[in-house]
């Protein structure tokens, strides 16, 4: 959680808010099929439903009130993965900063799976 203090009080933003914003921003990028999570039992990556997207996002809080975000995504075939990754980074950084006022130190994108067809 990050606390934003003002002269009239404070606002605390929970981890769930950051994961929802980041997951939604990433999933809405062109060529992203969705967020993925790795199954502990079989080691296979599974596409997450919209309501479970936070499982494909990890948020780390730093002492200087910045955050780092790790995203695990599935992309479509035939795309430039580097370009998609950079678009995700830009979109997630913008959305998190504009919605919460929190500075994003890093956005790390892991393309864990590809969807053919």
Task: Please provide the spans of the model-predicted regions.
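Contiguous, often N-terminal, cationic amphipathic patches that form binding interfaces
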Residues: 1-77, 81, 86, 98, ...
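Glycine-rich active-site/cofactor-binding loop and its immediate structural neighborhood
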Residues: 93
């Amino acid at each position: 959680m990050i606390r934003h203090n003002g002269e009239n009080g404070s606002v605390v933003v929970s981890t769930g808010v950051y994961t929802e914003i980041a997951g939604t921003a990433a999933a809405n990028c062109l060529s992203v099929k969705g967020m993925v999570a790795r199954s502990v039992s079989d080691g296979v990556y599974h596409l997450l439903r919209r309501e479970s997207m936070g499982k494909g996002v990890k948020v780390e809080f730093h002492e200087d009130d910045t955050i780092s975000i790790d995203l695990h995504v599935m992309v479509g075939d035939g795309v430039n993965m580097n370009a998609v990754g950079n678009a995700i980074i830009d979109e997630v950084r913008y959305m998190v900063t504009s919605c919460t006022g929190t500075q994003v130190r890093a956005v790390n994108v892991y393309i864990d799976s590809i969807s053919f067809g």
